[in-house]
């Protein structure tokens, strides 16, 4: 009992430091939305600065503490002003998180250069004799730790609730834009939050230093512990952070006391992953959600490899192959090892670029898959005599299984939470490698045999060179094929807008699992070859710090460019290996480069080259602007020149919308026997939905007949778009059901609903801005392609045939909507009307049975609206069932067969346009009771 009490007291002391870290995390996140991965650096930095003031300047401990507060606070304030402030509103949360990781690495590198690798500690503030209560032994320094934590949290709580600055911080955390409009100095609030977090870190470092030793490696350790604590308790909750920190300290102490200290972190990480999977906001945190029908901010560009002529590719490939063939004779023997290590990391980085750069799934634990592959093959070879090739395959299979689990866990997570999961995964693998006997613990595994195939050993630098770089070339070719394929487009669409991609039929979890598996297998192969090349493997070689280095390599070369990150690998791998002086600065340089590229050069080196090439081609072509209006469709619609003007008012040919000879719509194919004119296609029965106690939709019911054009109208705030979100299951209804062609679809995933033939557009044009206009439409036809990842990576004949057919259909649809001349431009440059037409074309690409158009005329002038009306009629006339939410009454009354009117979340009228226009209840809803009685 007394032993357990001492363990718990030790856990509370350590947990108090974790609580201070977690509160700092929570404060910065609440105000700025940034997950400050440099928080742990403030603890070690504060203690190290104090040590310098006490030992070099001979200041008293109190004066040294105040001086440390000033130095660290000023440094953090300067960094916030120069780097972070504008990044908060200009880059995505995921990029911001990676940038904060770069700051942590920069702090580590600076601390290493200033204080070296030797750990430092202080004497206890009040002696070394513990206080004993019965058999409980409490270190006197523990009272300082717990007291400092309680006092800091109490003062912070008082300031947040009672002071003017506290009110400003709380207002900014609730709504940054609204706070700015109301005169709150938001930039100062962000600065204040970072300085306050730094102060909390310095306080923690000052009181914990007498109990433990601190050095530059402590920064990452405390960052990880604080992140676990705040994720457990709840981001944005001071008291949740306090509870999470104390609980984490106690759990780790109990595991260390009764199991092993080597497993305390691993068990905490497993708990963290489980909690984030079940409740991402933490145990006491609250959901910081937004509207699911409004796209999130995405930073940077998403590139597809340029489609070069085959002769160029063949000539370039042959030239490169010849150069690589003779490179071992050119490169000095001492540098071959550096070149081979560069190649091994290139193999990992190609997979990481697919995962993070192309698919947008930020992975801060990629080295974990290298560790799984390396340790699996090493253990099998050393302990059981298994051939290294079999070990490599086993490692890849093991990594694939872990990637499946990780992909499923991450399937429901986005942005920051996904990054936390992958970071926790990388740290977990490192912790297990350090703690398990079979891995050799911190000492690692030695005596690993060289990689061999059928008795041929790759036991020299030259042989390994050819093996590694052939694998890199194969990985690049397969990845480039995949990115240009149907699957690759959907991965890029998922990166641009996950909810938008899901609304087009993408199974998010399945897509994430697929790309995680591909990326993991590449990293695992690299890890296996890495272990056999060095004949040795230890946890620090494939630890979590290496994962952040991979992210830096990616950022330098250019995320999503495939070839660009190889430049980053060469810079950060080759130079430190051939230059010892550069190696001493590698951490600092790595961190600074990651911050600079993510903040100021998000396209990276190769991305900048592609930007320049694109700009030069555009200017050289002298392309003129196109109106973006739909052209008259007829026999010549497909071949019309891009700049040709079209007389407005001509009816779009129905044949162009159905694309002759390509089968029936998805909805018709999904229906049992198809529908017939006038039969109910879509039935909404008693739908209700409330948000925070406010009823947005109340008992809404209506029926849409097959082949009809129905409008859903009503004043602003009537609940029309919410009904669309309920029908497509972006929101789960509180009650009621939706019937599609006689089948209940309430509760089905959005991708399942689209597979049944129901597609939608959004109130705010939700195109994929970083994709080309043509690719946007092709994404809409994602389900028309049947080939899988492997077939499309190999570009089999059936894949090429599918691609040709889909592209032909997409170009015909673009011609119908007047966008054929802009097919290769980014969708972001289209005017609002052009983006609305692009959404219509994308929805029709999949041959839907039912289409929901949410305010398609928004932002259009009268001529464009008239043309839109003709398009809507043409879509209906081809057999599609159309439902529109629209405020333009001239358009609604001129083209619709049925009008459903909503007000205050209820249906108040339904019928023909003529009947609705004369309904007193409708007139009252729009113009008031007095007008209705006249």
Outline where the language-model segments fall.
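Transmembrane alpha-helices and adjacent helix-loop boundaries
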Residues: 94-118, 134, 187, 262-264, ...
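Transmembrane alpha-helices
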Residues: 15-25, 180, 184-208, 220, ...
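Short, non-helical or kinked segments that cap or interrupt transmembrane helices
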Residues: 25-47, 61, 90-95, 165-168, ...
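Hydrophobic alpha-helical segments within and immediately flanking transmembrane helices
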Residues: 14-27, 35-55, 75, 79, ...
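Glycine-rich phosphate-binding loops of nucleotide-dependent enzymes
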Residues: 34-37, 170, 175, 675-683, ...
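Conserved N-terminal flank of the Walker A/P-loop in ABC nucleotide-binding domains
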Residues: 23, 180, 350, 499-502, ...
């Amino acid at each position: 009992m007394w032993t357990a009490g001492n363990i718990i007291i030790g856990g509370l002391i350590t947990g108090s430091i974790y609580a201070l870290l977690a509160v700092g995390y929570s404060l910065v996140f609440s105000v700025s939305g940034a997950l400050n991965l440099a928080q742990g650096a403030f603890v070690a930095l504060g203690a190290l600065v104090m040590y310098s003031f006490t030992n070099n300047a001979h200041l008293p401990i109190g004066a040294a503490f105040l001086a440390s507060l000033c130095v660290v606070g000023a440094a953090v304030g300067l960094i916030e002003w120069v780097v972070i402030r504008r990044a908060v509103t200009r880059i995505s949360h995921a990029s911001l998180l990676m940038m904060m990781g770069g700051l942590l690495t920069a702090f580590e590198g600076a601390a290493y250069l200033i204080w070296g690798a030797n750990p430092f500690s202080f004497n206890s503030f009040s002696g070394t004799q513990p206080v004993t209560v019965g058999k409980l032994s409490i270190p006197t320094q523990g009272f300082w730790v717990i007291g400092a934590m309680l006092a800091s949290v109490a003062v912070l709580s008082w300031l947040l609730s009672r002071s003017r600055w506290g009110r400003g911080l709380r207002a900014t955390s609730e709504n940054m834009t609204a706070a700015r409009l109301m005169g709150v100095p938001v930039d100062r609030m962000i600065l204040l939050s970072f300085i306050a977090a730094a102060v909390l870190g310095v306080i923690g470092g000052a009181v914990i230093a007498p109990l433990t030793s601190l050095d530059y490696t402590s920064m990452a350790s405390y960052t990880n512990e604080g992140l676990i604590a705040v994720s457990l308790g709840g981001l944005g909750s001071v008291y949740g952070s306090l509870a999470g920190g104390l609980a984490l300290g106690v759990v780790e102490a109990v595991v260390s006391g009764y199991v092993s200290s080597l497993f305390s972190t691993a068990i905490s990480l497993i708990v963290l992953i489980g909690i984030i999977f079940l409740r991402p906001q933490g145990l006491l945190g609250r959901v910081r959600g937004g509207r699911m029908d409004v796209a999130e901010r995405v930073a940077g560009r998403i590139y597809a490899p340029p489609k070069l002529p085959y002769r160029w590719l063949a000539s370039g490939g042959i030239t490169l192959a010849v150069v690589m063939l003779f490179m071992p004779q050119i490169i000095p023997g001492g540098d071959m090892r550096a070149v081979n290590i560069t190649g091994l990391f290139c193999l990992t980085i190609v997979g990481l670029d697919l995962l993070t750069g192309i698919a947008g799934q930020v992975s801060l634990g990629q080295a974990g898959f290298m560790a799984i592959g390396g340790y699996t093959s090493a253990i099998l070879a050393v302990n059981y005599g298994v051939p290294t090739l079999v070990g490599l395959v086993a490692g890849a299979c093991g990594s694939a299984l872990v990637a499946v689990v990780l992909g499923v866990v991450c399937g429901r997570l986005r942005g920051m939470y996904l990054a936390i999961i992958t970071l926790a995964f990388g740290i977990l693998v490192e912790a297990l490698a350090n703690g398990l006997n079979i891995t050799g613990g911190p000492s690692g595994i030695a005596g690993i045999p060289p990689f061999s195939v059928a008795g041929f050993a790759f036991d020299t630098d030259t042989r390994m060179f050819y093996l590694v770089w052939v694998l890199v070339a194969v990985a690049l070719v397969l990845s480039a094929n995949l990115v240009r394929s149907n699957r690759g487009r959907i991965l890029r669409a998922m990166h641009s807008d996950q909810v938008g991609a899901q609304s087009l039929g993408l199974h998010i979890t399945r897509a994430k699992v697929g790309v995680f598996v591909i990326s993991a297998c590449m990293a695992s192969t690299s890890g296996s070859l890495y272990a056999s090349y060095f004949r040795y493997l230890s946890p620090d070689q494939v630890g979590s710090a290496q994962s952040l280095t991979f992210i830096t390599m990616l950022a330098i070369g250019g995320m999503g460019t495939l070839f660009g990150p190889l430049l980053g690998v060469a810079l950060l791998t080759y130079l430190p290996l051939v230059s010892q002086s550069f190696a001493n600065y590698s951490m600092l340089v790595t961190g600074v480069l990651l911050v600079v590229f993510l903040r100021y050069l998000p396209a990276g080196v190769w991305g900048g080259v592609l930007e320049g090439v694109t700009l030069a081609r555009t200017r050289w072509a002298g392309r003129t602007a196109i109106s973006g209006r739909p052209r008259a469709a007829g026999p010549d619609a497909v071949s019309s020149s891009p700049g040709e003007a079209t007389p407005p008012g001509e009816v779009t040919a129905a044949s162009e919308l159905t694309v002759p000879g390509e089968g029936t719509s998805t909805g018709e194919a999904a229906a049992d026997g198809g529908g017939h004119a006038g039969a109910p296609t879509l039935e909404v029965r008693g739908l209700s939905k409330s948000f925070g106690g406010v009823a947005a939709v109340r008992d809404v019911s209506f029926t849409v007949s097959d082949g009809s054009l129905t409008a859903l109208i009503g004043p602003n705030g009537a609940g029309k778009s919410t009904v669309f979100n309920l029908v497509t299951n972006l929101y789960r209804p509180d009650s009621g059901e939706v019937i599609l062609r006689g089948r209940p679809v309430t509760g089905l995933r959005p991708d399942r609903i689209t597979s049944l033939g129901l597609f939608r557009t959004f109130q705010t044009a939700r195109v994929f801005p970083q994709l080309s206009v043509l690719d946007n439409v092709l994404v809409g036809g994602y389900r028309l392609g049947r080939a899988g990842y492997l077939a499309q990576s190999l570009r089999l004949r059936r894949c090429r045939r599918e691609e040709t057919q889909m592209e032909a259909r997409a170009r015909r649809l673009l011609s119908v909507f007047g966008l054929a001349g802009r097919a290769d431009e980014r969708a972001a440059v289209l005017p609002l009307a052009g983006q609305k037409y692009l959404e219509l074309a994308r929805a029709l690409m999949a041959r839907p049975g039912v289409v929901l158009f949410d305010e398609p005329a928004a932002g259009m002038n009268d001529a464009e609206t008239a043309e839109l009306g003709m398009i809507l009629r043409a879509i209906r006339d081809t057999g599609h069932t159309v439902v529109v939410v629209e405020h333009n009454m001239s358009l609604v009354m001129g083209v619709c067969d049925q009008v459903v009117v909503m007000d205050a979340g209820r249906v108040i009228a339904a019928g023909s346009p003529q009947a609705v226009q004369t309904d007193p209840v409708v007139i009252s809803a729009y113009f008031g009771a007095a007008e209705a009685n006249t």
